[in-house]
């Protein structure tokens, strides 16, 4: 439903429910057909696959209530918002969790939200602003939807890949769940790219570093 509300997210390829063939137990994704256990989709309305059934609405409302009324979760999330940020510049270093979206040529990827174009630092500033509005501001569906985009959007600085949760959960063929990474992960070890990113955030020291979360750590190496 979020994807349908926001064509600017450019995530129509993640609309998969209408591609399930309930008769022969398969799903076709990007031209490839895979077997799938259709018994797991007994409540799916093939005429309106992206509408929740009354029972599903009840489950979602119960989950929403539990999350919204968890005092411990409120405390933890409040701490993250009060102390954290999408990125931080500290001691001539740049700290961020995911990536700085790049295009295939290693330039900052330009993305459009709210009829404005963002790239590099301006994209992360925009993400931080909307995340805070979603938490502190009056209820706004667009802001809440953007929080979902930050989790799984192709050009989200917190994600950096074409996330395939559906394929991992329901398709046994592992080739279906290979996630295409943002070009950032191809370039990020190159000095000129690191320097370009640091300059974008007004960091010019010869001892500046990018401290990048969301990257695997090899144990015992």
Map each language-model feature to its residues.
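Feature recognizes metal-dependent phosphohydrolase scaffolds
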Residues: 1-221
């Amino acid at each position: 439903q979020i994807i349908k509300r926001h064509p600017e997210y450019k995530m129509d390829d993640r609309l998969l429910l209408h591609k399930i063939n309930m008769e022969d137990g398969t799903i076709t994704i990007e031209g490839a057909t895979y077997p799938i256990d259709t018994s797991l989709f007994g409540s799916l309305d093939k005429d309106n696959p992206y509408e929740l059934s009354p029972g599903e609405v009840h489950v979602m409302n119960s989950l929403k209530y539990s999350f919204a009324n968890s005092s411990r979760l409120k405390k933890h999330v409040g701490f993250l918002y009060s102390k954290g940020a999408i990125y931080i510049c500290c001691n001539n270093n740049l700290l961020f969790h995911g990536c700085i979206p790049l295009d295939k040529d290693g330039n900052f990827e330009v993305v459009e939200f709210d009829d404005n174009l963002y790239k590099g630092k301006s994209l992360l500033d925009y993400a931080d602003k909307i995340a805070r509005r979603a938490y502190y501001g009056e209820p706004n569906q667009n802001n809440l939807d953007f929080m979902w985009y930050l989790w799984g959007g192709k050009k989200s600085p917190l994600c950096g890949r074409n996330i395939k949760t559906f394929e991992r959960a329901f398709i046994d063929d592992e080739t279906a769940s290979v996630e295409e990474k943002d070009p950032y992960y191809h370039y990020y070890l190159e000095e000129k790219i690191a320097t370009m990113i640091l300059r974008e955030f007004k960091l010019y020291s010869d001892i500046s570093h990018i401290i990048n979360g969301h990257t695997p750590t090899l144990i015992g190496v």
